[in-house]
């Protein structure tokens, strides 16, 4: 169960980061303020919820196990940047993502 909470905390944290990125997207001057406030508001909600879930994780898992699992954020952000904004991700970056996932599996199996 705590693993699900950890993944959800990670996804909400990344969601907050992605909302911040979306807030910076260029728009016409007329809708800019509303666009900015909407995405920044969503970012705050996501990050606030992530913080609450993170506190639940820290009550259960040792910080030495829990904190490295937040490396999932790098994986989620890379996938989102690639799929949502069609950013180029070089092979070396994908290798890094694979190594991060491997590290998470190794650390997770030790818990």
UniProtKB/Swiss-Prot annotation:
Per UniProt, residues of the EamA domain are 40-109
Q: Which GO terms describe its biological process?
A: lipid A biosynthetic process; lipopolysaccharide biosynthetic process; transmembrane transport
Looking up SUPFAM superfamilies in the UniProt record yields:
Multidrug resistance efflux transporter EmrE
Which UniProt keywords are listed? Cell inner membrane, Cell membrane, Lipid A biosynthesis, Lipid biosynthesis, Lipid metabolism, Lipopolysaccharide biosynthesis, Membrane, Transmembrane, Transmembrane helix, Transport
The pathway where this protein functions is: Bacterial outer membrane biogenesis; lipopolysaccharide biosynthesis
Query: What membrane topology term does the record carry?
Result: Multi-pass membrane protein
Which superkingdom does the taxonomy of this entry point to?
A: Bacteria
Please tell me whether the keyword Transmembrane helix is annotated for this protein: yes
What Gene Ontology cellular component terms go with this record? plasma membrane
| Known role | Translocates 4-amino-4-deoxy-L-arabinose-phosphoundecaprenol (alpha-L-Ara4N-phosphoundecaprenol) from the cytoplasmic to the periplasmic side of the inner membrane.
- Family named by the database record: Belongs to the ArnE family.
Query: What protein does this entry describe?
Result: Probable 4-amino-4-deoxy-L-arabinose-phosphoundecaprenol flippase subunit ArnE
Q: Which organism is it from?
A: Salmonella typhimurium (strain LT2 / SGSC1412 / ATCC 700720)
């Amino acid at each position: 169960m705590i693993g699900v909470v950890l993944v959800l905390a990670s996804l909400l944290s990344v969601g907050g980061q992605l909302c911040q990125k979306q807030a910076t997207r260029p728009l016409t001057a007329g809708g800019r303020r509303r666009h900015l406030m909407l995405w920044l508001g969503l970012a705050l909600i996501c990050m606030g919820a992530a913080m609450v879930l993170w506190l639940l994780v820290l009550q259960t898992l040792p910080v030495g196990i829990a904190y490295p699992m937040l490396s999932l954020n790098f994986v989620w952000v890379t996938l989102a940047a690639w799929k949502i904004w069609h950013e180029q991700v070089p092979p070396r970056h994908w290798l890094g993502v694979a190594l991060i996932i491997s590290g998470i599996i190794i650390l997770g199996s030790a818990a």
